[in-house]
Curated annotation (Swiss-Prot):
Cofactor needs: Mg(2+)
Compartment annotation: Cytoplasm
Species, as recorded: Methanopyrus kandleri (strain AV19 / DSM 6324 / JCM 9639 / NBRC 100938)
GO biological process: CTP biosynthetic process; GTP biosynthetic process; UTP biosynthetic process
Function: Major role in the synthesis of nucleoside triphosphates other than ATP. The ATP gamma phosphate is transferred to the NDP beta phosphate via a ping-pong mechanism, using a phosphorylated active-site intermediate.
Family matches, as Gene3D superfamilies: Nucleoside diphosphate kinase-like domain
Gene Ontology CC, one term: cytoplasm
Subcellular location, principal: cytoplasm
Chain coiled-coil ranges: none
Catalytic reactions on record: a 2'-deoxyribonucleoside 5'-diphosphate + ATP = a 2'-deoxyribonucleoside 5'-triphosphate + ADP; a ribonucleoside 5'-diphosphate + ATP = a ribonucleoside 5'-triphosphate + ADP
CDD domains xref list: NDPk_I
Gene name, Swiss-Prot/TrEMBL: ndk
Name of protein: Nucleoside diphosphate kinase
Amino acid sequence: MAEVQREFVMIKPDGVVRGLVGEVIRRLERKGLKIVALEMRQLDRETAEKLYEEHRDKPFFEDLIEYVTSGPVVVMIVEGRKAVKVVRNIIGATDPAEAAPGTVRGDFALDIGRNVVHASDSPESAEREIEIVFGKDLSTIDYERCDEEWLYES
């Protein structure tokens, strides 16, 4: 049986102001993932810089930080078996020009700088990003989906 993972997902300002929050959540939930924490907030610069630390030396870093702090974001933790890989498949390639139709970015994004959603790229990144955004004293909701027995083999 595959291990249940937690994945960090953030709907970026372009996704929020374009009214895509419900669409992103719908796709995650219809796949069978559980949302165990969710919040709308305005990222401060310090949090954004920690979140995107790996890009600090890249030429687009400053524009990225300005962008993700420019408007509201929706941050969430989703849970499920192989959640990181499943979410990455749902949202599509980072560059919307390479994202397959049917993915969030393939359907709703045109520019790599405005690609609707961020998700961690590994279980380790997910743990790190969850702690950065939600803090160490994270409180999540534990519940069972009514269709869980139909989603997974034992």
